[in-house]
Swiss-Prot record:
Divisome component that associates with the complex late in its assembly, after the Z-ring is formed, and is dependent on DivIC and PBP2B for its recruitment to the divisome. Together with EzrA, is a key component of the system that regulates PBP1 localization during cell cycle progression. Its main role could be the removal of PBP1 from the cell pole after pole maturation is completed. Also contributes to the recruitment of PBP1 to the division complex. Not essential for septum formation. Keywords: Cell cycle, Cell division, Cell shape, Coiled coil, Cytoplasm. InterPro entries: Cell_cycle_GpsB, DivIVA_domain, DivIVA_fam. Forms polymers through the coiled coil domains. Interacts with PBP1, MreC and EzrA. It comes from Bacillus licheniformis (strain ATCC 14580 / DSM 13 / JCM 2505 / CCUG 7422 / NBRC 12200 / NCIMB 9375 / NCTC 10341 / NRRL NRS-1264 / Gibson 46). The lineage of its organism: Bacteria, Bacillati, Bacillota, Bacilli, Bacillales. One of its GO terms (biological process) is cell division. It comes from the Bacteria. This is Cell cycle protein GpsB.
Length: 98
């Protein structure tokens, strides 16, 4: 999924060779800069992996919570009906059930 969007990998950056001209860039400066870019790529890749794992975990938790919610609602309705029945018995006494 990530490989489709990213054009360069850390390995490709590391192995990239630049031709030198008469008055080209200092190779040492280019190498230092590319090393920083590689470290950033690796850090971003690691962060993306961790976030994708967390995202999957949260989706599973949400799915489980949604599955449990209707069961809790039925239990709550049962409790309300039971309390209502007890209140009716208390208010109207046994006349209601005779």
């Amino acid at each position: 999924m990530l490989a489709d969007k990213v054009k360069l990998s850390a390995k490709e950056i590391l192995e990239k060779e630049f031709k030198t001209g008469v008055r080209g860039y200092k190779q040492e400066d280019v190498d230092k800069f590319l090393d920083m870019v590689i470290k950033d790529y690796e850090a971003f890749h690691q962060e993306i992996e961790e976030l994708q794992q967390e995202n999957l975990q949260l989706k599973k938790q949400l799915e489980e919570a949604n599955k449990r919610q209707p069961a809790q609602s039925n239990t709550t309705n049962f409790d309300i009906l039971k309390r209502l029945s007890n209140l009716e018995k208390h208010v109207f006494g046994s006349k209601l059930y005779d």
